[in-house]
Amino acid sequence: IDLDVPYISLSGGEPMVHPKFFDLVEYAAGRGSQLKIETNGQFLTPEASQRLKDARVKSVQVSLDGATRETFNKMRVRGEFTEVVQGIRNAADAGVPLEINYSPTKFNTHEIGKAVDMAYELGAHAFYTGRTMYTGTAVKTWHLLCPSAEQYVDYFRVLHEKSAEYEGRMRVHFHEQGILSEMRERLQSPAALLIVLPNGLVKLINALPFICGDLRKESLQDIWTNFQNAWQDPQIVQFVHDMENDPKKTADLHKWIFV
């Protein structure tokens, strides 16, 4: 905050389960930083939604990976579709700016059109999606999750149609090319964005395993300098190059490499 950080996003895991969540929200938002919350939506009670509105958060992004209860609950095995939809409605009723995020899988790509329609009907101002990344828990179940090439073709065809349909009313934003294309762009034009992990380590970007600092030992100002220099580190350039031959290297993103 003292460094005039303009934008903060709280994600997880699930940030709203933290006992100090609203203390952090109200502290950050009350000192001029724009704040985004990425949540599963199940904790967006009317009371919580009103507090987010009162704190003037910039947006709340909810993961809604299906347009039906059957599909959503298959994806989010500990979630409940009706609770998430109600949470979205609570946030909308409170006047909280809403975004919807959708992760494509073998069993939910066919619902993308309905999901975009639902997002608009629920009051979202933006809808985000793209190709599912080979990382995290998805690595263990990739054979069950990854859409086929044919499914992706139809998926993005529908998204292009929906983007045109909702132009001027809701932004439908999607990354069609995948993580490798994004990493190539980042090497040329790094985003001014740090990823701070719960343990204080700071990553260059979520899709790469590189650490540029530790907030328990270094100041944010020093880490920012490290961040700017790190994108030219030969290790990172080589890692992105290796991804061209082995896209599954993204599975290594939790094997921390300090630069």
Where in this protein do the model-derived segments appear?
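Short, conserved alpha-helical segments within structured domains
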Residues: L44, F107-E111, F239
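Radical SAM enzyme [4Fe-4S]-AdoMet core and its adjacent flexible, acidic
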Residues: K53-A55, S63-P190, I195-K203, A207-E218
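Alpha-helix boundary/capping residues
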Residues: S59, G79, A119, F227-A230, ...
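Flexible mid-to-C-terminal extensions adjoining Fe-S/redox cofactors in radical SAM and related proteins
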Residues: I205-V259
